[in-house]
Amino acid sequence: MDEKLFTKELDQWIEQLNECKQLSESQVKSLCEKAKEILTKESNVQEVRCPVTVCGDVHGQFHDLMELFRIGGKSPDTNYLFMGDYVDRGYYSVETVTLLVALKVRYRERITILRGNHESRQITQVYGFYDECLRKYGNANVWKYFTDLFDYLPLTALVDGQIFCLHGGLSPSIDTLDHIRALDRLQEVPHEGPMCDLLWSDPDDRGGWGISPRGAGYTFGQDISETFNHANGLTLVSRAHQLVMEGYNWCHDRNVVTIFSAPNYCYRCGNQAAIMELDDTLKYSFLQFDPAPRRGEPHVTRRTPDYFL
């Protein structure tokens, strides 16, 4: 299709998605094909320039994503970096992930979308995205288009050479960013190994490496964060993956920050959400927000299993 025509169609899709109306199956298919072409050119450590606004988990809470854009500025007026977990748990995974992918295809230089541990075939079959696709489309094709696309998402991003962003955390198999650049990311998230760790690990109060209670990834202490940041010339590791009640949380003597962008997570946790604005000098400020007002929540019968780690 002619590029100008496609852009026009894309703008119509974005307009529709902004009203929380899903695209057709064939539209999702062509959107995902276009997104693959763009993402395949991105690095495992995708370089991002400031100013940029960094966001954590969204988890299908579409109306709260709209609130995030209201607080942080619309795309493409504001540059965004999302650190994964677009789907599962919330009621609107389909609309949420479709909108973010559409914005990526439309404004590729202005938005970066990383892979979270929920951008996986296995996890989405348990925590809601698969069932939601079946409910909204009557078959699993849309789930397949998206989960195939997830394999192409970059694993990490580097803002101005100094702030390292990723979904989960560090890995005992990775000392340098070059180690990450050398990984083959075009695959389902493995059960173990460096790629798994980047999407599953958590910072911990105890030093060194520890066994993760999640059953994947590791816990890592302040000594590990400091060593990693120093070795790679970094000032900060920015990550998501954990519910924090204020929406953001410093740890490891400000070597690591956790950002969580799904307010009142699972519609019941009572937490605030936050995003981190980095200005052109890399000064950061946090914007906190509460859930968007909702009219008439859909009633979902099947309760998905809980894990709040």
Curated annotation (Swiss-Prot):
Its cofactor is Mn(2+); Fe(3+); Zn(2+). InterPro entries: Calcineurin-like_PHP_ApaH, Metallo-depent_PP-like, PPA2-like, Ser/Thr-sp_prot-phosphatase. Inhibited by the interaction between PPP2R2A and ARPP19; this inhibition is enhanced when ARPP19 is phosphorylated. Inhibited by the interaction between PPP2R2A and PABIR1/FAM122A. The modification Leucine methyl ester is found at L309. The modification Phosphotyrosine is found at Y307. Catalytic subunit of protein phosphatase 2A (PP2A), a serine/threonine phosphatase involved in the regulation of a wide variety of enzymes, signal transduction pathways, and cellular events. PP2A is the major phosphatase for microtubule-associated proteins (MAPs). PP2A can modulate the activity of phosphorylase B kinase casein kinase 2, mitogen-stimulated S6 kinase, and MAP-2 kinase. Cooperates with SGO2 to protect centromeric cohesin from separase-mediated cleavage in oocytes specifically during meiosis I. Can dephosphorylate various proteins, such as AXIN1, p53/TP53, PIM3, WEE1. PP2A consists of a common heterodimeric core enzyme composed of PPP2CA, a 36 kDa catalytic subunit (subunit C), and PPP2R1A, a 65 kDa constant regulatory subunit (PR65 or subunit A), that associates with a variety of regulatory subunits. Proteins that associate with the core dimer include three families of regulatory subunits B (the R2/B/PR55/B55, R3/B''/PR72/PR130/PR59 and R5/B'/B56 families), the 48 kDa variable regulatory subunit, viral proteins, and cell signaling molecules. Interacts with the PP2A A subunit PPP2R1A. Interacts with the regulatory subunit PPP2R2A. This is Serine/threonine-protein phosphatase 2A catalytic subunit alpha isoform.
